[in-house]
Amino acid sequence: MFLKIKKIPKVNWSSDKPYNFKPKFSTFFFLCFGLTLFGLGEGLLIVSFTGASPWSVLAQGISLNVNLSIGTITLLISIAVLILWIPLGQKPGMGTIFNALIIAFMIDLCIKFVPTPSNYLNQLILAVISVMMVGRGGGIYLVSNLGAGPRDGLMIGLQKVTNLPVAAVRAFLEISVVSIGWYLGGTVGVGTLLFAFGIGPCVALGLFLVDKIFD
């Protein structure tokens, strides 16, 4: 059962170590493909106008209580999360860098070319699709083992410490983050809740499918 997955699978195109800046072509391809899906999903969530992601809600909530912009707060949160990697034994890699570049590019692409659906039902459907895409993309790029993004790295580190399933750890992180953000005044929408409660199972399913297909 995919909800019980407790580690990132290793397949024939997985890198032996995260700190690898000369990976096989197949490893690099799946890293970029996974991050492209991930970024597309993030962009579609924004375009759906059903609510921001949990970490954006946290940034908004903090921004309302301090004299800093949401963008600055987002950067500071990412730095804080990366610092938390140290006691968890997480290491950055090529994927950590490409995570920021590809996802940002895909979000901008979505906002520019994908129109917001005209009715709310279609907006919700788009939000559901976006969460599934982030999960699948996350599963693919994490299996490449070339380094995770800040939040995914925190998830992996906490999973190793707690030995809990990936889905449970990710759900705990997202729900905690959105709860704090909401308490601080951040705006929570249906899409936010779909992401918070759905991303853990979707990432676990993504990992499960990659393992089964390439095993």
PLM segments and residue spans:
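Core subunits and conserved enzymes of cellular information-processing
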Residues: 2-215
